[in-house]
Curated annotation (Swiss-Prot):
It comes from Chlorobaculum tepidum (strain ATCC 49652 / DSM 12025 / NBRC 103806 / TLS). This is Probable nicotinate-nucleotide adenylyltransferase. GO terms for molecular function: ATP binding; nicotinate-nucleotide adenylyltransferase activity. The gene is nadD. Transmembrane segments: none annotated. Its EC number is 2.7.7.18. InterPro entries: Cyt_trans-like, NadD/NMNAT, Rossmann-like_a/b/a_fold.
Length: 195
């Protein structure tokens, strides 16, 4: 079975995450997608609570599964007492899904930071890396394929970011074009990202 791991803070999950998941399923021939909500060691703190981010990620998974059940959510990283790194998550998924071929889905922004990740060189022993390019990443910043972190690169142009969504929500602007309706409703009902 080919299982993809898609980790992130999902603060909030948005249409880019949804489209990437569906795109990856078709292009990478995935059988299962594990959406893992995490604490980002490179960010000071999330704007929404762990519970809210998990709830929104569950809504994202429901949206992904409308096209056919293959996604599930994992809260394993949030349950860890200290920082959880990608290598830890991959080892956990290997234990849970023995024999599966693992694919790590990352955006180009994350891929560019990978050399700074803990145990970056170990990651390749556990998975294939699938990188999804973003139009808002300057090509001059993108190194050629890192020989130490080879990856499969996919062109993926979905110009939406969680930062932009949080700013719009804080300013009382509509966000419905950037997030699935279930997530927009959750954000409004729970008054997330309000100033």
């Amino acid at each position: 079975m080919r299982t993809a791991v898609f980790g992130g803070s999902f603060d909030p999950p948005h249409n880019g995450h949804l489209a990437l998941s569906l795109f990856a399923r078709e292009l990478a021939g995935l059988d299962r997608l594990i959406v893992s909500v995490s604490k980002n060691p490179f960010k000071a703190a999330a704007d929404a609570s762990d519970d809210d981010r998990s709830a929104m990620a569950r809504l994202l998974v429901a949206e992904i599964n409308v096209a056919g059940v293959f996604a599930e959510i994992s809260g394993w990283e949030l349950q860890q007492s200290g920082p959880s790194y990608t290598i830890d998550l991959l080892r956990h998924v290997e234990e849970r899904c023995p024999g599966d071929e693992l694919v790590l889905l990352v955006g180009e922004d994350s891929y560019l930071q990978m050399p700074q990740w803990k145990f970056a060189s170990e990651i390749l022993k556990h998975c294939t890396i699938a990188v999804f390019g973003r139009s808002d990443i300057d090509a001059a910043d993108a190194p050629p394929s890192d020989p130490l972190l080879p990856a499969i690169h996919y062109d993926f142009d979905m110009p939406v970011s969680a930062t932009k969504i949080r700013r719009l929500a804080a300013a009382g602007q509509p966000i419905g074009q950037f997030v699935p309706s279930s997530i927009a409703q959750y954000i409004a009902e729970h008054k997330l990202y309000s100033a």
